[in-house]
UniProtKB/Swiss-Prot annotation:
Pfam families: HATPase_c (PF02518), HisKA (PF00512). The lineage of its organism: Bacteria, Bacillati, Bacillota, Bacilli, Bacillales. Its EC number is 2.7.13.3. It comes from Bacillus subtilis (strain 168). Its main location: membrane. This is Sensor histidine kinase YcbM. Keywords: ATP-binding, Cell membrane, Kinase, Membrane, Nucleotide-binding, Phosphoprotein, Transferase, Transmembrane, Transmembrane helix, Two-component regulatory system. GO terms for biological process: osmosensory signaling via phosphorelay pathway. GO terms for molecular function: ATP binding; phosphorelay response regulator activity; phosphorelay sensor kinase activity; protein kinase activator activity. GO terms for cellular component: plasma membrane.
């Protein structure tokens, strides 16, 4: 009996020692975890807390802490990206709005400074003033649209889109402009229904931008075209003209924000230098790509490529 009591006492003593050691080790691990977490938060570090342990509860705690830290970093990065985008937008706006505001102010001063101005001249200036004011409003809207696209605030729902109808609708939208300027139009849209993963509103804006560019810059060639083609995996819409074209240097930069050199077509969208930038962002939002090829007075073509849907 005495031996059993001694064995029991020894077992309890060993158990207490083991529990003490485990508690001390856990306390040390928790203290280390707390120190590492404090360090990461104070330095805004993107690291993780790595600690080899057999303690399942502590493992779960570390996993959750690392997930929280990772999520915090993602939120911080998104905030920084949005803030940077807004700063760029405000900088570009302040620079790009000066010219139209100066023109508008000039019209106002001209009207105010001459009380005896003939009614016909006054109406002409008021018409110009109205036009420039509308352009300014459209420009501001474009800035905000681009800011939303770049900050990921603008969601573009992707659905199955009938590409034949989209192309026909948009070319018809510019029929009067094509006719009035004496253009010929080469339209190649297949009879076979073609579908793509896209967004109708985004496609309308893209095609309207590209077609208006082709009309404006293709005047020398008097010919514009729209082609819808497809293979097993992709569809492609190409808008082309035979105008003065785009130099190789400008082809590399034509999609940049506010790139408005004389040879560039980015200026065409309400004169803001945002049209092709917005076009590129919208295309990318739909999982597509946009490319440009140009030989002056032969063929300047912008091609949008999207994933085809066959089901």
């Amino acid at each position: 009996m005495t031996v059993l009591w001694v064995a029991a006492v020894i077992a309890l003593a060993c158990l207490n020692v083991i529990q003490f050691i485990m508690k001390k080790k856990r306390d040390g691990n928790l203290a280390y975890t707390a120190d590492q977490l404090s360090y990461m938060l104070s330095r805004d570090s993107a690291g993780q807390i790595l600690l080899p342990t057999d303690d399942h509860a502590l493992k779960d705690l570390l996993v959750n802490i690392n997930l929280i830290v990772e999520n915090r970093q993602q939120i911080s990065a998104q905030f920084a990206k949005t803030e940077q985008s807004m700063k760029r937008m405000l900088t570009n706006m302040s620079h790009d709005l000066k010219t139209p505001l100066t023109v508008i102010l000039g019209y106002i001063e001209a009207i105010q400074s001459d009380p005896n101005m003939p009614d016909e001249e006054r109406e002409r200036l008021l018409g110009k003033l109205r036009q420039k004011t509308n352009e300014l409003i459209q420009m501001i809207n474009s800035f905000f649209d681009l800011a939303k696209l770049e900050s990921e605030d603008k969601e573009i729902p992707i659905t199955k889109v009938h590409m034949n109808d989209i192309c026909k609708r948009n070319i018809l939208h510019y029929y009067d402009a094509v006719q009035s300027k004496g253009f010929q139009a080469a339209i190649d849209i297949p009879d076979t229904p073609v579908y793509a993963q896209a967004n109708e509103e985004a496609l309308d804006r893209i095609l309207q931008n590209l077609l208006s560019n082709a009309i404006q810059y293709g005047a020398a060639g008097k010919l514009i075209g729209l082609t819808l083609s497809y293979d097993e995996r992709n569809i492609a819409i190409t808008v082309w003209d035979r105008g003065k074209g785009i130099s190789e240097t400008d082809q590399q930069r034509v999609f940049e924000r506010l790139y408005t050199l004389e040879e560039s077509r980015n200026k065409a969208f309400q004169g803001s230098g945002l049209g092709l930038t917005i076009t590129k962002r919208l295309t990318e939002k739909m999982g597509g790509i946009i490319s440009v090829q140009s030989k002056p007075y032969e063929r300047t073509a912008f091609t949008i490529t999207l994933k085809r849907m066959t089901y």
